[in-house]
Amino acid sequence: CSCADMTDKECLYFCHQDVIW
């Protein structure tokens, strides 16, 4: 996935959750 703001911890958190699951 990709986050509009790569410094957005919440976005990155859910992004990585999606990768894991």
Swiss-Prot record:
Give the originating organism.
Atractaspis bibronii
**Top-level taxonomic group:** Eukaryota
The Gene Ontology biological process terms listed for this entry are: regulation of vasoconstriction; vasoconstriction
Give a single Pfam family match: Endothelin
A cellular component term, taken from the record's GO annotations: extracellular region
User: What are the protein's UniProt keywords?
Assistant: Cardiotoxin, Disulfide bond, G-protein coupled receptor impairing toxin, Secreted, Toxin, Vasoactive, Vasoconstrictor
SMART domains linked to this entry: END
Transmembrane ranges, per UniProt, are: none
Entry's InterPro entries? Answer: Endothelin_toxin_CS, Endothln-like_toxin
Q: List the disulfide bonds.
A: C1-C15, C3-C11
Specify whether Transit peptide is a keyword of the entry. Answer: no
- What is an example of a GO molecular function annotated in this UniProt entry? toxin activity
Subcellular compartments = Secreted
The name this protein goes by in its record: Bibrotoxin
Q: Provide the site residues for: Endothelin-receptor binding site.
A: W21
- Family designation: Belongs to the endothelin/sarafotoxin family.
Q: Does the keyword Metal-binding apply?
A: no
- Give tissue specificity per the record: Expressed by the venom gland.
The free-text function statement in the UniProt record for this protein reads: Vasoconstrictor activity. These toxins cause cardiac arrest probably as a result of coronary vasospasm. May act by displaying agonistic activities towards endothelin-1 and -2 receptors (EDNRA and EDNRB).
